[in-house]
Amino acid sequence: MPKGIIGKKIGMTKVFVNGKAIPVTVIQAGPCYVAYTRTQEKDGYNAVALTFGERKEKNIPKPLLAIFKKANIKPAKVIKEFPLKDGETVEPGQEIRIENVFEKGDLVDITGKSKGRGFTSVMKRWDFAGFPKSHGHRYHRAVGSIGCRTEPGRVWKTKRMAGHYGNETVTVLGLEVVDIIPEKNVILVKGSVPGAPNSTVFLKQSVIADRRKGKLKLAKSKAMYA
């Protein structure tokens, strides 16, 4: 089985576990279908490409459409490769469901596109404090000084200034799987997830699960939810 799956963010709610309210994000994860596989002998690595969603055939590039037809699956909106778990194999056209990949108490890393906020000031983009709110000046939300004089005679790269904010790829590490509802292809993840409702997200086995703090968090999560 793959080490990840593709899903769609539905929204947020809360569930009660042992009398404690847990804020969770609801994600419709799968069902996904295998488009093709990569092997160590032929490609140099082991992976599987999963598809999610639907798309009109007329809007699909012909090379990609040929992949879907070869696997005997419907044209999909999203296609992405995931590494395979050790010693496991899948076949093109095979259905992958959320319960095949994750279980309660697992730690997952979730990648998505953050909400786009357009051109914003430094107070919103970088959390600047701004100037005093008293009267007598007009610089309440201004950026302030952006450099020196003759030396260096320019604005340093990476200087925090106003500009485009959001609409970036963001990954949140080590989120806990609170519950899985197989009959609805739904997974409940503790905390917030990047992106707007109905946006595509990618769920993967967490990279922090093998670290010391990650192992402690995983054991605590398993004891609470599993």
From Swiss-Prot:
Any Gene Ontology biological process: translation
An example of a Pfam family matching this protein is Ribosomal_L3
Matching entries from SUPFAM superfamilies are given as: Translation proteins
The residue range of the signal peptide is none
Which GO cellular component term is one of those annotated?
A: cytosolic large ribosomal subunit
User: What keywords would UniProt list here?
Assistant: Ribonucleoprotein, Ribosomal protein, RNA-binding, rRNA-binding
Molecular function via GO = rRNA binding; structural constituent of ribosome
Look up the domain of life of the source.
Answer: Bacteria
Q: What biological function has been recorded for the protein in this entry? A: One of the primary rRNA binding proteins, it binds directly near the 3'-end of the 23S rRNA, where it nucleates assembly of the 50S subunit.
Q: How does it assemble?
A: Part of the 50S ribosomal subunit. Forms a cluster with proteins L14 and L19.
Family statement: Belongs to the universal ribosomal protein uL3 family.
Cited NCBIfam families: L3_bact
User: Any idea what this protein is called?
Assistant: Large ribosomal subunit protein uL3
Gene symbol of the encoding locus: rplC
